Amino acid sequence: MFDSIIIGQYVPGDSVVHRLDPRVKLTAVFIFLVFMFMTRDPLLLTVAVLLSFGGLLASRVPLSFYAKGMRFISIIIVLTFVLHLFMTGGGEVIVELPFATIYSGGLIEGFMLAMKLAMIITIASLLTLTTTPIDLTDGMERMLAPFKRVKLPTHELALMMSIALRFIPTLIEETRTIVLAQLARGTNFSEGSLWKRLKALIPILVPLFTQSFKRAEELATAMEARGYAGGEGRTKYRQLHWGLKDSVVLAVFLLFAAAVMAERFMGG
């Protein structure tokens, strides 16, 4: 289960998605996350599917790697679909069961929400799979640059967000190691009452928090040893360059956002 979470990991490559400016990728992901949940139109949902899988294919990330990452989230997607299927009414009756009645409205709502979740995970994963931590930090810093006028520490905020995102795989690996160690000691996480199973998590959470603080302290020490003193006066070896392909990608996502807005406010 722990190996199947890919958000926060980076896959080296030289695809067109890898070469995109991190600012356009961050903006595209933000637009997609906001407007994906706003749309209820099947045609726009189809466009979102094409955008998601088009980006996945263009990134040249192995489909097997992505499929592994969807293994865990698929449980949530299926559960969401089933809950809507049995708990949402409206429309025509499809089938009547002894314990529930399935309506066409529940089927459509469940399918659309499940697809939205899958597409959001795809786009969010593409951001970290195709963007290095340094580029991600630089992109966030440049996007937050206007807030420097109100004395906001934009570089430090961008660095914290980037580090937090990149610590996800590390924490997952730490959790997996601790769980395996506890299983080797005979700990059973699946039997007993709910209270006993919650108590069994304590030997996982305590060392996990301890290791997290230890790694944070080691990272801070390493940054200080390398002379890091914040972003003031810091120069960058690699400069960000906004090109034609970045403008095209941004225009595509802005058109998607405009179409969703038109559907919401003009289509009722």
Swiss-Prot record:
Disulphide bridges: none
Pfam families per the UniProt record, alphabetical: CbiQ (PF02361)
Record keywords: Cell membrane, Membrane, Transmembrane, Transmembrane helix, Transport
Keyword field contains Transport: yes
Domain of life: Bacteria
Protein's cellular compartments: Cell membrane
GO annotations of cellular component type: plasma membrane
Membrane-spanning residues: 29-49, 75-95, 107-127, 152-172, 242-262
GO molecular function per UniProt: transmembrane transporter activity
Keyword check for Transmembrane helix: yes
Membrane topology: Multi-pass membrane protein
Subunit-structure text: Forms a stable energy-coupling factor (ECF) transporter complex composed of 2 membrane-embedded substrate-binding proteins (S component), 2 ATP-binding proteins (A component) and 2 transmembrane proteins (T component). May be able to interact with more than 1 S component at a time.
Family that this chain belongs to: Belongs to the energy-coupling factor EcfT family.
PANTHER family cross-referenced by the UniProt entry: PROTEIN ABCI12, CHLOROPLASTIC
HAMAP family: EcfT (MF_01461)
Record function comment: Transmembrane (T) component of an energy-coupling factor (ECF) ABC-transporter complex. Unlike classic ABC transporters this ECF transporter provides the energy necessary to transport a number of different substrates.
Protein's name according to its UniProt entry: Energy-coupling factor transporter transmembrane protein EcfT
Source organism (scientific name): Bacillus selenitireducens (strain ATCC 700615 / DSM 15326 / MLS10)
